[in-house]
Amino acid sequence: MIVELDCGNSFIKWRIIDAFSRVLSSGVVESIEELVHALDEARTSHEFAHCRMVSVRSDDEVARLESVLAQRFGLRVSAVRPASCLAGVRNGYLNHERLGLDRWMAVVAAYRLSAGACLVLDLGTAVTADFVDADGEHRGGFICPGLPLLRRQLREHTRRIHYDAVAANDLTGGSFAPGRSTAEAVERGCVLMLRGFVASQLELAKEYWGDRFEIFLTGGDASLVADVLPRAKVVPDLIFTGLAIACPIPS
């Protein structure tokens, strides 16, 4: 079985797949310790043979995780490295090593799935948008705060905005009428900012390609903007798809 890891800014997503890419087990944790516990439980049902990982964390954190996986599970990790070109996509950054590896994996996966021009949107802790031409040229993209960061900034940098963000998660209720409480006002305002950003990316993609492009949507908050992009393909595991392309397992 193959252990796959997506180590993002806030969470570590993990899953166990078989040789046919069928997902046997998966989860989301906040720390290496929680990951070890989850994999210990998964190991009772599945025998691990390989591990591949994409991470946006520091070199020290990656080295620590690789060491833990080797010592605890006997796994040698195949990790994504920066590249100027991969699977037909040419990295659009002036310094290709500076493009976040999670974005790179999403771009590579989307291009493989579309085989043409595509707009790639990932709504997580940060929100990213990337543009790829039909010939695989990555035009670059945009990064802005995601919903968790928008909430946090308002709570930390204003004196009188205090509310339970967990309890407020459902306060939009599909409505974007002006909020009648601080929590409603913040939640609806932040979601509207995300939706406006996404709409602007759609218009830019149309300027580039007319209607000849596909849209890929991923990330934990993708559902908040899906109706803004009725043509979008929602692919929750887009980064894992890219990971499989970047780090194939020898047969």
Curated annotation (Swiss-Prot):
Enzyme nomenclature, EC number: 2.7.1.33
UniProt cofactor(s): NH4(+); K(+)
ATP-binding recorded as keyword: yes
Residues binding ATP: D6, C7, G8, N9, S10, F11, I12, K13, T125
Main enzyme class: transferase
Gene Ontology molecular function: any one: pantothenate kinase activity
Protein name as it appears in the record: Type III pantothenate kinase
Organism, as annotated: Azotobacter vinelandii (strain DJ / ATCC BAA-1303)
